[in-house]
């Protein structure tokens, strides 16, 4: 049985948001804890949280979460792919497949993750109305390629140019594409959560 690891990307500056995104609260819980709980529920054994801006706050907030931390010292000047590389290095040898998510995509359905994990392929991602979402699943065999990729497009560019087996799953889960970059995005997330709860109670 393959070992499942997780990388949560939480190194960003949150420059367009007036608050620190990973620790913003939805339904009494921080965004990053929503993501951790989603991964734990999917059977992820080892989770690496990549920190940068406000490193100490995240580490204190997650002191009881049973996760590993990896620090991107150049977080203010690097793209997300560099944080991912740091997270993958910390996870090296602990996983055969890796679930990857930013810390600010907190409302993905657990069923969506189960459906993604049921698929094979070097790289698996959800598609919501033609838009690529999160989380994505990476086969550990792709890690050496990601470590040396120097082309455009970040993770997506690396995967799409590699010739690997790319598997896409059409989903009805809007939570896969609802991130949190601006105050308006956060209000949209809160409305989505409220509507989802109302529907589940019917």
Language model segments and positions:
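Conserved alpha/beta core of the MobA/IspD/sugar-nucleotide pyrophosphorylase nucleotidyltransferase superfamily
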Residues: 2, 144, 150-202
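Conserved donor-nucleotide/metal-binding helix-loop-beta segment in metal-dependent transferases, i.e.
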Residues: 108-131
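A short, conserved beta-strand element in the Rossmann-like catalytic core
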Residues: 14, 106-107
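Short glycine- and hydrophobic/aromatic-rich loop-to-beta-strand nucleating segment
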Residues: 134-138, 178-180
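Short beta->alpha linker loops
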Residues: 53-54, 75, 79, 111, ...
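N-terminal glycine-rich phosphate-binding loop and ensuing alpha1 helix
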Residues: 2-51
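Conserved N-terminal catalytic core of the sugar/cofactor nucleotidyltransferase
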Residues: 33-97
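Active-site acidic Asp-centered loop
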Residues: 101-103
């Amino acid at each position: 049985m393959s070992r499942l690891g997780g990388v949560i990307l939480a190194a960003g500056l949150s420059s367009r948001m007036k608050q620190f995104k990973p620790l913003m609260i939805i339904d009494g819980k921080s965004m990053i804890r929503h993501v951790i709980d989603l991964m734990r529920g999917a059977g992820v054994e080892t989770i690496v949280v990549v920190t940068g801006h406000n490193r100490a706050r995240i580490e204190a907030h997650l002191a009881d979460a049973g996760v590993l931390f990896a620090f991107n010292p150049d977080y203010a000047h690097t793209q997300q792919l560099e944080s991912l590389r740091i997270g993958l290095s910390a996870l090296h040898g602990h996983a055969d497949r890796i679930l990857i998510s930013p810390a600010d995509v907190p409302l993905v359905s657990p069923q969506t993750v189960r459906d993604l994990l049921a698929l094979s392929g070097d790289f698996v991602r959800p598609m919501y109305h033609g838009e690529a979402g999160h989380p994505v699943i990476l086969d550990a065999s792709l890690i050496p390629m990601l470590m040396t990729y120097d082309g455009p497009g970040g993770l997506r560019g690396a995967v799409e140019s590699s010739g690997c087996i790319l598997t896409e799953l059409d989903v009805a889960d809007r939570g896969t594409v609802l991130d949190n970059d601006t105050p308006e995005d956060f209000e949209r997330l809160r409305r989505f959560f409220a509507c989802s709860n109302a529907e589940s109670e019917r």
